[in-house]
Curated annotation (Swiss-Prot):
The protein's name in its UniProt record: DNA mismatch repair protein MutS
Recorded name of the encoding gene: mutS
Lineage: Bacteria, Pseudomonadati, Rhodothermota, Rhodothermia, Rhodothermales
Family statement drawn from the similarity comment of this UniProt entry: Belongs to the DNA mismatch repair MutS family.
Keyword ATP-binding: yes
Organism for this UniProt entry: Salinibacter ruber (strain DSM 13855 / M31)
Keyword rRNA-binding: no
Purpose: This protein is involved in the repair of mismatches in DNA. It is possible that it carries out the mismatch recognition step. This protein has a weak ATPase activity.
GO terms under cellular component: cytosol
Amino acid sequence: MAQSSTQQRGRTPLMRQYYKIKERHPKAILLFRMGDFYESFDDDAKTVSRLLGITLTERNNGDADDVPMAGFPHHALDSHLPKLIRSGLRVAICEQVEDADDSSGKVVDRDVVEVVTPGVSFHDQLLNPKQSNFLAALHFGTGRDKDRIGFSFIDATTGEFSVTEAGLDQLQDLIQTVAPSEVIVDKRKTERLQQHLREVPFTVTEQEDWVFKYDFAYQTLLEHFETHSLKGFGVDDMDLGVVASGAALHYLGETQKGALPHVRKIKRYSKDEHIALDPETKRNLELVQSIQDDGHEGTLVSILDETETPMGGRRLRAWLVRPLRDVGRIRHRLDAVEACVDDRTLRDDLREELNQMGDLERLAGKVATGRAAPGDLIAIKHTLRRLPNVLGLLTDADSDALGAIEDDLRSCPEMVDRIQSALVDDPPAKISEGGLIRDGYSEELDELRTIAQEGKDWVANLETEESERTDIPSLKVGFNKVFGYYIEVTNTHADKVPEDYIRKQTLVDSERYVTPELKEMEEKILTAEEKIETLEQELFNELRSQIAQQTGILQENAELLAHLDCFAGLAEVAEQHDYTRPSVDDGLTIDIEEGRHPVVEQTLPPGDPFIPNDMALDPDDEQVLIITGPNMAGKSVALRQVGLIVLLAQVGSFVPAEAAQIGVVDRIFTRVGASDNLAAGESTFLVEMNEAANILNNATARSLILFDEVGRGTSTFDGLSIAWAIVEYLHERPEVAARTLFATHYHELNAMADRLERVHNYRIQVSEHEGEIVFLRKLIPGGADHSYGIEVAKMAGLPDAVIARAREVLQNLESQHLEVGADEADGAPSEDPPSEDPPSGDGVRAKKGEADAVPDLEDSQANQMHLFGQPDPAAEEIKEMLGEIDPNRITPVEALMKLAEMKETLAD
């Protein structure tokens, strides 16, 4: 807030200083260091008081009005800061940068030393050890690039810095994959950002438009990397990406108030290197977040994460949301995992060594930015000390993949020796506490310590000597920060006090004195201790700077150890859960024998074994598998487990199956279940159609599609028609002939297997005995012809009266209204009892391969159930509309418009 000169003159010098600093950080909560407290004022104080639950008071402001104030002790910063940041706030930490004793009566100099934001923080209390904390920058293109974006993301704690360019329609995918905590954007484009995202699960920070100018961004990057061009990083042709990257780096520098030497390179992030996973797929497969509560339990990462280090855990999460497409890289990872699976001793020994290591990746960032405390350097020492053992294990391993890590890993004995010789084994948490430098490291420091210790020994002896000399048995020698050293005598012995004692302080029951000799020794001790503190600070800073010069080596070691941790962890999972190595190639065949769902099999009750299933997909014969069966029988699990097995294989992990051949996929699509997006005004059906349209418009012949209950969000005929048309579309269009699993409750779709040569029917096996059903969860060839809806309702606990009445109504409807003729194989339910044998399909009129043949909707409609009398006349009009539709020509948009027209007809 701008302050007039009149306002400034009316305030106290301290408050004038506060407002001057606050003007530079108007959008941040300013925590203003005053002695042992952090204080906040005005609106900041009200916010701090409300969020932290601390008292709101007032502070005198000279001739101006008193101002609201709220504060807390400086040592409570670590507990209060997370609450402020997790509320989406920016916090500017203002410290005293001058010793109060040196201020000569004027206001102590203060300055902001750090701005903490959701996306930029080095505070351990704000960070999840096994999750990256990304700051992202988004730049919208203009002109011919109006439908493109530049997107950059950086983790301040590790120095990881990446950039990409993409179509605007891929923004949601990028956000979901990177999961930034904060996104910076041109303040003029905030609304546009919100328009293109269904939800904004991060803090949006607006920046001035000049931050997003190409020349400024380009120069910012050149100055930081100290280069003449960006060609060496392979990003010089990404104009939009350069702007986003420069904006991100500028913002990071502004918040951290210093150099960022650990940000050593910028990488080109190419979506073509990874499987494309849209937000719906990540959510439906529950890779890192549970559908139920967005938590950790029940996710794929909760089963797979057996890593021993935080950096390994972060790397594993990145692998899961960005699986590889390159067969060579996938096989390299599989080779490394296999080496750890085959050699149990090697795996156990590696994991034991990794378990003793610190988070070298983030420790390197702390050292480089001057934030490392003594304990951080000790953690680096302990980690590096383990490397010779790791190298020895890798040398003995018979694996080229692990040998590649051995070749690049550096043990850094000089760095270990330097830290060992300089720091005590268990240093204090803060440098100011002293006693962190080891004896013998500095001759000057040793001399000062000797002086201080001899002085303290003299003081300790003084108490005994003076007690004997004065015959005062209760005489004590003490020290406090205000009066220094003193001799304390109780009032009982006041008459024995010698004349050379000088009274210093009077207490209720005693008096405190000093002597010339004691004051002289006090000055000697305090001078030595002051010099010790200063020298220890200098020595530690020098040591930290020396280690910082090796930041690059630390980061490279951290990356290699993170990979090794992932390999050993994935091997441990494979051993524990009986996974097998998949065969991965560039073909288009997916063939899984005895596959299992990696999460569900671990969460079943004891004694309830998971039933494995085979699954084979290929573009020449079994391109589309239609899976029918009752609700609760396991259709959705079967679909998801195929998606997860394929994903795990391309991560480079072993898979839960007896055997698996995986032809790499470029995308995994899922349309699973029914859900509303009410916040965006989208119904269940519209959400379904949006997701289906995304799949049909973006799938390729190398994609994997998992459709579950498409069309459930609308009427039976609408849903059936759309489901039928989607299957035909995928079958008949070579450019989108993706490998597809299509789970459905529309038994009419079984007829498609006789019409389309690459469509096959499968069903979930069900056993019936004396009116009771058992879901066997086994996938077998053939289509189901019974839904078992009433049986499922009974299992769900509906009252017996409701179940009995439902059976009565069903029997009446089947006997009176389902007049099935010679065309019963076209999809109408049969009156015959359910059979385990797959329907033959002999009664289907169209021959296999006749894609133009569609079900006779008029005949099918005539067979439908009319519970409340004759059909509505509006239905006849809708029949005519349907008869005019050519499913092979209508577009998804036209289909939606036609459905809307039909609904209006019914409403009329």
